[in-house]
UniProtKB/Swiss-Prot annotation:
It comes from Mycobacterium tuberculosis (strain CDC 1551 / Oshkosh). Its cofactor is Zn(2+). It is an enzyme of class 6 (ligase). Monomer. A motif ('KMSKS' region) lies at residues 267-271. GO terms for cellular component: cytosol. This is Cysteine--tRNA ligase. GO terms for biological process: cysteinyl-tRNA aminoacylation. It comes from the Bacteria. PANTHER family: CYSTEINE--TRNA LIGASE, CYSTEINYL-TRNA SYNTHETASE. NCBIfam families: cysS. Belongs to the class-I aminoacyl-tRNA synthetase family. ATP binds at residue 270.
Amino acid sequence: MTDRARLRLHDTAAGVVRDFVPLRPGHVSIYLCGATVQGLPHIGHVRSGVAFDILRRWLLARGYDVAFIRNVTDIEDKILAKAAAAGRPWWEWAATHERAFTAAYDALDVLPPSAEPRATGHITQMIEMIERLIQAGHAYTGGGDVYFDVLSYPEYGQLSGHKIDDVHQGEGVAAGKRDQRDFTLWKGEKPGEPSWPTPWGRGRPGWHLECSAMARSYLGPEFDIHCGGMDLVFPHHENEIAQSRAAGDGFARYWLHNGWVTMGGEKMSKSLGNVLSMPAMLQRVRPAELRYYLGSAHYRSMLEFSETAMQDAVKAYVGLEDFLHRVRTRVGAVCPGDPTPRFAEALDDDLSVPIALAEIHHVRAEGNRALDAGDHDGALRSASAIRAMMGILGCDPLDQRWESRDETSAALAAVDVLVQAELQNREKAREQRNWALADEIRGRLKRAGIEVTDTAEGPQWSLLGGDTK
């Protein structure tokens, strides 16, 4: 499918849905803010991955060459704090949880990024960016840190709509700041923390700087689309724009933000204790069903989790799966065809997946009627179109990804990667006789539906009432 009809996307910076015109014809460059690998992933984390995987798949279906960069934040305050609390090296903590995120994305068939840079691998580029900002008069040193001078950039607030007098960075009071609205580019060295040498002394990067430097390294000074969760609009993305453009870069031309997964109207968050872990969800539903559910709402909408909504999604997915199996059994092989015009119109209209799904189920109803009437050609056309459309959404029931393996085994394999990360931390806590932490990890796993049994061969885990590994 190479027809490139007009694609319209909601640009947060413009505040409207507008025509998407790539910087280079036929090519699209995308940067997605990936995980801060401080803990295990929950479904709120992976919704962003699914939402923008659909964008990527749609662009590929339209014939575009897509460069898709998703970073890993592997050095950050929360990572350092949690690693220290667990008595583990920060780099080990980050690497362990990075593997868990990779397993979660893979379980839901989120396409691997073109590149997945880690923040710690791009310190040189970050230092170079700070040097440019200082030379341009947009950054200064103070108290061992380096800060961005917010008042030096008159366009500050263009993404979030924040008025300059209302800006609160959430960094707390710092003696080295000229103005408390300024934000940190580089943090001076502290005892027990990792640090790198710079012209301003040893230290480590600020969170906002990391993404600007990595995006530029892989996509150049200007690129098409920057994606992320809506909670990143301010201050993270606002600060990325300010520092990148102040350094002379055009940076992102479109800004897309996905809504949260909520429970009881509140954002799913570990700090609120209302998370649904990937192990728990993969115990209850198949990976393809979970992906269907996470992608079913419009990407900019909040996705309020409920058991009823989850089961409705499972029922809808199984209905499509059953239809495709009926056609294959009664008619023959079903190859992916082309999406219908209504499906294409829906995705071209700011990725309106709910309308696209309505079209898919309309085609299924037509196909069932054709099959019941003995119209095998009509049923096959419907089935082929459904395969194409569901493939773009990343959950085609007849795709080899889901058909060529036992999905239960696949889900257990993904869960095993996630659980082993926690079991490793528990074993290290036990070695250090930190029984409170070991018990806390065991309790956390149990709340996620995982029972841990200590044996002579080491800890074994099992799903409550299910399989053992």
